[in-house]
Amino acid sequence: MWQKIKDMHMEKKRSFRMLLIMELCLLVAGVIGLFGKDDVYYFDSHEMVSSVGGYSQEKEGYFLDESCGAVSGAVKLGGISLPRGVYTVSLYYETDTFMGNMCNMTDLAPQYKTFLCNGEHLYEGLGVTDFQVWVLKDKENLALTVDYGGTGYLLVQGLEIAQSNALSRIFLFCVILGALSVNACYVYVMYDKTYVIDRKDKNILAGLVLVIAFASLPLMVDGMQSNADLVFHLMRVAGIKDGLQMGQFPLRIAPEWQQGYGYACSIFYGDTLLYIAGFLRWLGFSLITSYRLFVLIVNGMTVLIAYYCFQKMFRDKYVGLMCSAVYTLSIYRVAKLYVNGAFGEACANVFLPLIVYGFYRVFTEDIEDKKYGRAWIPLTIGFAGLVQSHLLTGELTGLFTILLCLAMWKKVFRARTFTVLAKTVIYSVLSSLWFLVPFVDYMLRGDFVIQNVAEREIQYRGVQLAQLFSVFFNRGNNVFYYNNGLSDAQPSGIGIALWLPLVVFVGILYFRKTKGLSSKDLKVGKIAAAFGGLAMCMTLLAFPWDKIQFLSSISKTLVSSLQFPNRFLIIASVCLTVVCGVVMKWAMNTWGQKGLVTCVAGIVALLLVSTVYLMNDMVYNNSGYLVYDEECIGSGYVAGGEYLPYGTDASQLMYGKLNYDEGIEIADYSKTGLNIDLTCRNLGQQDGRIELPLLYYWGYKAQDAVTGEEMQVFKGTNNVVSVVVPSGYEGQLKVGFESPWYWRMAELVSVLVVLGLGVSVYIQKRKEMSGHEA
């Protein structure tokens, strides 16, 4: 294909050259726009007005206390004019409450979506806000308002609004992305005119676009689907953005999480695909836009990868398309993505078809075929992707991989097969070493909440049998069906588009109508049906998880980590998608074109009455969640707090909270992310300690800024970073997080392995292509 495109000599076409010139002009304009966006607007407290507070000449600001009562708009500043751009709003204040007061900006002459702002809560010990506003049209009548909560005191001292070049960065990014898209469409149209693209391929392309569009329907409303895990994952996105801004790559500890104490979520929970959303947020997009684009990209990746894998397995593009549709629009995937906001499992869904396809090749292809030696590629990408996206799904997949290898044990020990499987393990581990080494290091070295939940039972969180075979699902909130029944239940099933093909396949076997299937497809169908059925059974309330859990200490840890048995539906979904493909092949081989049309029409109808029905309920019965900037949701939410050092009282983690022994004096204190600079001296006769507003994780170091002398760092009260200051010491201390050398070495190994494997596969492909041409 690439040679045919070269033969078209696009560079000689006048229209294409004009298109490139236009794109170049836009690129130049975008680059120029990056400069000169650094205006700063200052407003002192004299320009503000207050309906209840008194002005303090001594502290140069408006002072409010409990005698004022709770007042909305207690302090105001109007008449703010800002040109189009993205700004950081810094209100300088003092308060003794936590999230009791609020600062916001509003447009007094509002126009739809021309001014985006959520504001920020005010915190004791912080002293300045840091929220963003998006001014998408020149504004002349903006206002700042400060709401007083009625408790404690509040002193409002001044305002600073700093412009950034974020809009220009967004424009440049959109120009680059738009240019690539337009050029691709142009080449496609010209290719069609020159060579005439096969109608079947056009149908497939249109079908894939439609599936992506339908999978993204909930994104086509104003707002995000509010759900249990959404805030947690939005915090992860914000953490990646903050880490990138502060030069931390890859992200290990989110610097702003937990009131600036930091949270090591990224060490335990892979962020690989989530870096897409983090990069978009860092680029300047609002949090909601970054979320939407990320979900759209994940939907696209799921559709395309599933299509590639299933059409390769079943050797038919239409079967691949319909399997991709059934898998992407499966009830469990849609519910997890939109109802639960489970980004980790949504990312895991991207890679599962690669693992299924990889094992299909390993156990069905001719081992003498030259291509057999490359069967490790989809398996390696799939397993590495799972490990770096969602370890729990990796745990489930590992269990079923063991079962599959036991079932196929004779083939496993063939020399070439064993080599392929060994390569999969080795390359998956090496390419994931950058994530696995810190993870294992902390699990062995530390003591975290996640290591102390082995007694948590999961069986009572199982699903009812009726849920597995339900047809119509509604968006609900109830996830505990053992005593609440199915009233207001969350969608926890596989959907009729997956269980009906299973019923048909069982009927084919029962009535011995298997002539329409090859022995290979029949065996694949049997294994997929068995594994899918087993996975469904493991989600039920009746499955004896409690007995299994307490068999040993290992089973305790593994079972409790699952949290919800319905996680096995992710395995059931991909297995039953394979069954659906087998049934389609049977129908096509039995009835020809009529069988294909019947299957396509039937699958579309089933998806409409199940998944699209669920999406409709989600869109119309859930209020939109508009979050432009993460500052408005605070930084303290950590879901179950699994990655906190065990025993930490998160409610005591307050901004700027310093504790130090008697005899120690501190001056010139400053904190940026995970780095603290301070000048101190110890006048005492003994070594003293300073407890800093950083949560203790292995990797923090403290040293003298001049001599480089290292100070002892240890876990202090409430698991915060504590530094030992020797008696008589006087100087400047620098404290910060630093990845150990072996973490960095693991990162280098992963990069080299991925690059090496990529180059090796590319060279091998080129050699094969050269051989075919010769």
Role assignments for model-derived ranges:
Residues 1-37, 166-218, 514, 525-526, ...:
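Start-transfer (signal-anchor) and selected internal transmembrane alpha helices
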Residues 29-36, 212-223, 242-252, 285, ...:
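Membrane-interface helix-loop junctions at the exits of transmembrane helices
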Residues 420, 427-511, 630-650:
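Periplasmic/ER-lumenal interhelical loops and adjacent helix-loop junctions
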Residues 396-429, 508-517:
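Perimembrane helix-loop-helix junctions
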Residues 213-351, 358, 385, 392, ...:
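Active-site lumenal/periplasmic loops and adjacent helix-entry segments of GT-C-fold
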Residues 195-197, 651-774:
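Active-site-proximal, structured, solvent-exposed surfaces of multi-pass membrane proteins
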Residues 375-390, 425-430:
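Membrane-interface alpha helices of multi-pass inner-membrane proteins
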Residues 355-375:
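Membrane-interface transmembrane helices that cradle and orient dolichyl/undecaprenyl
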